[in-house]
């Protein structure tokens, strides 16, 4: 969540038009897109969380129900923020943002369901919907009804195939944004699947699974569309070590706090503090002030919204 806020505040396309940003060092604006590593991390965590949610003998219907339930919890947070966004956009209209009132019923329905969010920064909502309600049931059914290691090898191959379509401009909406992050979801799911069943696998199956994980990491590094390929791999490895790191550095309370409100912070920080009040915020000409005010304000707003 810290990386995401930093990326949205100081990214190449985040700086608001008409605001004096000459005080921001050029190297900072060039380095800020590296922080978009938050998207692979989010989708990895989604896959990891979903990998633990499958029972021993699932039906495809039960898997779809589980995926929908997971998405619905997130959607309730999204819908609350959508209502707040509509109120803010009516009170402080901006020409760069779409008006919900001007949308037809089809686009309005897509906005409400989260399949086509009205705010550009909320595009991950559609990615999350595809991951939980489509990709998860398919992955879970395949790995539970076919030998686990061969099925995961097949998923790895499919993920690379879809990732190769990442730069096809004719793919609309979610079909265009999803393929680059598909291997990260598969990796997260594979890690959870193996962690929950490693004791039941034979030695050869365990070695095969470890090899597949290594190939998956390598594929993310070699085929990723992101310029921060090496950082992607480093941070995915860091996620595995996170429990040990947080204990050693005594960061557990802080990370727990940010994790509890991360979804609300992701949805609220940009449309209020990135669009509507950015002129006053960037006018301070202080990187620390802009980042800290955005972070703290977003956290406090998330805590207040959590009580609704």
Predicted segment positions?
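Alpha-helical transmembrane segments
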Residues: 1-5, 77-81, 152-159, 208-214, ...
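Alpha-helical transmembrane segments of multi-pass membrane proteins
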Residues: 2-16, 86-92
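Transmembrane alpha-helical segments and their boundary/interface "anchor" motifs
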Residues: 23-26, 32-43, 52-117, 131, ...
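Membrane-embedded glycan-lipid processing machinery
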Residues: 31-38, 115-126, 169-179, 222-227
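Hydrophobic cores of alpha-helical transmembrane segments in multi-pass inner/ER membrane proteins
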Residues: 40-48, 127-134, 183-189, 236-241, ...
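Structural signal for the C-terminal ends of transmembrane alpha-helices
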Residues: 50-58, 91, 137-144, 164-165, ...
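Solvent-exposed interhelical
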Residues: 132-158, 190-208
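Alpha-helical transmembrane segments and terminal signal-anchor/GPI-anchor hydrophobic tails
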Residues: 161-266, 270-294
